[in-house]
Amino acid sequence: MRLFLSLPVLVVVLSMVLEGPTPAQGVLDVSNPFDVLEEFGKTLEDNVREFINLITQSELPAKTRDWFSEIFGK
């Protein structure tokens, strides 16, 4: 159930990251394009780490492991 909820959240976060700056934010000083890529990479890394932590802290892996143990343990 939580996986069904976390996938739409991931899609929304990725769409927010990829849509670019809003007009209120203005244009960034693009003196070095690698700085922009580095900032994007760090933001993406933080979002992915948060998503992975959310999955590992959920009950789904434990329930799945218990289910497989119950089914194949017989």
From Swiss-Prot:
One GO MF term: phospholipase inhibitor activity
Protein family (similarity comment): Belongs to the apolipoprotein C1 family.
Signal peptide segment: 1-26
Source species taxonomy: Eukaryota, Metazoa, Chordata, Craniata, Vertebrata
UniProt main location, coarse: secreted
Keywords recorded for this protein, A-Z: Lipid transport, Secreted, Signal, Transport
GO annotations of cellular component type: high-density lipoprotein particle; very-low-density lipoprotein particle
InterPro entries, A to Z: ApoC-1_sf (IPR043081), ApoC-I (IPR006781)
Record's protein name: Apolipoprotein C-I, acidic form
Originating gene: APOC1A
GO BP terms, alphabetized: lipid transport; lipoprotein metabolic process; negative regulation of cholesterol transport; negative regulation of lipid catabolic process; negative regulation of very-low-density lipoprotein particle clearance; triglyceride metabolic process; very-low-density lipoprotein particle clearance
Other remarks on this protein: Apolipoprotein C-I is present in acidic (APOC1A) and basic (APOC1B) forms in P.paniscus, P.abelii and P.troglodytes and perhaps also in baboons and macaques. The two genes for ApoC-I arose through a duplication process that occurred after the divergence of New World monkeys from the human lineage. In human, the acidic form has become a pseudogene sometime between the divergence of bonobos and chimpanzees from the human lineage and the appearance of the Denisovans. Pseudogenization resulted when the codon for the penultimate amino acid in the signal sequence was changed to a stop codon.
Protein localization: Secreted
Tagged with keyword Transport: yes
Annotated organism of origin: Colobus guereza (Mantled guereza)
